[in-house]
């Protein structure tokens, strides 16, 4: 779910905090990518026709493999250095949200049956997408694929967004890429949206700078966390009647959730019971993550050609010629990515360059500040096209 209404709130109140960037501006940069979010996007869009998805001969869905394979090659071709971070065990406080998602999928499944009976194709596609769930098998398939591609994989002990933010704060990566805005709530210094969007949509990457977000909103980090909780997050329901703008006004006026609650008009606003905002705050400020010093050095290695062919062609029915051509593209892309950014030739380490609060001049000049909420929209799709296709419609 992320943080309700946060994208528009930032666009309306902290214009300088968001810049439009070209995909290629991140050449040589290490980017932590929320793997589960990417897989979800691929399952929603890749190879989909109504309620049908790409499958192998055993009837197992392969859309996630095709999407991950093709998009990762595209990322590497642009010279980026992706690090995919996978979710671990969710916090207990998230169980209520997960239960709600399960119920929504169940409702969507019933609506899907009705849509199929009435022959309404638009509703069939709509409700089919709402039934999508990223499974353990989907995650395992993609972990295996990425390792065969020679791309680093991180397994978070809990929330992937928190692990990504920790890597970013520790300067292990330059930025975090996801579509969930709670990456900012966890403290990511740089946050990217639309990085995994298909090239065909021609959407710029949106780069959020947390320091400028705080400056624009007039809050410190503790107050920003409280704002996100008040807006509505995975750990706490919203308070009916309090939208993002009202939440910002209240936090600016009172400074903390405790004082907001003390001064809240109880006749007008009903606080959910329970409303565990203190535990939610703790999870955002002190999440369960791998200590940065224990994270191994990231390495991008040569792809395992035979392993990829076995997984994609033999096990999942991908076209052999397309896969082999894609692997050649992957090898070329790996060589390009290994060149690194220009500063590396002058002895500047990646961690040193990350300490700058703003992007290099070449990137800043290419970036374009986002000034309207309309320019900041959530991603809706993953790539439909790529160098390798496999499977058949389910």
UniProtKB/Swiss-Prot annotation:
It is found in: Nucleus, Nucleolus; Nucleus, Nucleoplasm; Mitochondrion. Binds 2 magnesium ions per subunit. They probably participate in the reaction catalyzed by the enzyme. May bind an additional third magnesium ion after substrate binding. Phosphorylated. Phosphorylation upon DNA damage induces relocalization to the nuclear plasma. This is Flap endonuclease 1-A. DNA binds at residues 71, 159, 232, 234. The keyword Magnesium applies. Structure-specific nuclease with 5'-flap endonuclease and 5'-3' exonuclease activities involved in DNA replication and repair. During DNA replication, cleaves the 5'-overhanging flap structure that is generated by displacement synthesis when DNA polymerase encounters the 5'-end of a downstream Okazaki fragment. It enters the flap from the 5'-end and then tracks to cleave the flap base, leaving a nick for ligation. Also involved in the long patch base excision repair (LP-BER) pathway, by cleaving within the apurinic/apyrimidinic (AP) site-terminated flap. Residues 343-394 are annotated as: Disordered. Residues 338-346 are annotated as: Interaction with PCNA. Keywords: DNA damage, DNA repair, DNA replication, Endonuclease, Exonuclease, Hydrolase, Magnesium, Metal-binding, Mitochondrion, Nuclease, Nucleus, Phosphoprotein. Interacts with PCNA. Three molecules of FEN1 bind to one PCNA trimer with each molecule binding to one PCNA monomer. PCNA stimulates the nuclease activity without altering cleavage specificity. Gene3D superfamilies: 5' to 3' exonuclease, C-terminal subdomain, 5'-nuclease. Its cofactor is Mg(2+). It comes from Physcomitrium patens (Spreading-leaved earth moss). One of its GO terms (molecular function) is magnesium ion binding. GO terms for biological process: base-excision repair; DNA replication, removal of RNA primer. InterPro entries: 5-3_exonuclease, 5-3_exonuclease_C_sf, Flap_endonuc, HhH2, PIN-like_dom_sf, XPG-I_dom, XPG/Rad2, XPG_CS. GO terms for cellular component: mitochondrion; nucleolus; nucleoplasm. Its EC number is 3.1.-.-. Its main location: nucleus. Belongs to the XPG/RAD2 endonuclease family. FEN1 subfamily. The gene is FEN1-A. Mg(2+) 1 binds at residues 34, 87, 159, 161. Residues 123-254 are annotated as: I-domain. It holds the Pfam family XPG_N. Mg(2+) 2 binds at residues 180, 182, 234. The keyword Metal-binding applies. Residues 382-394 have a biased composition (Basic residues).
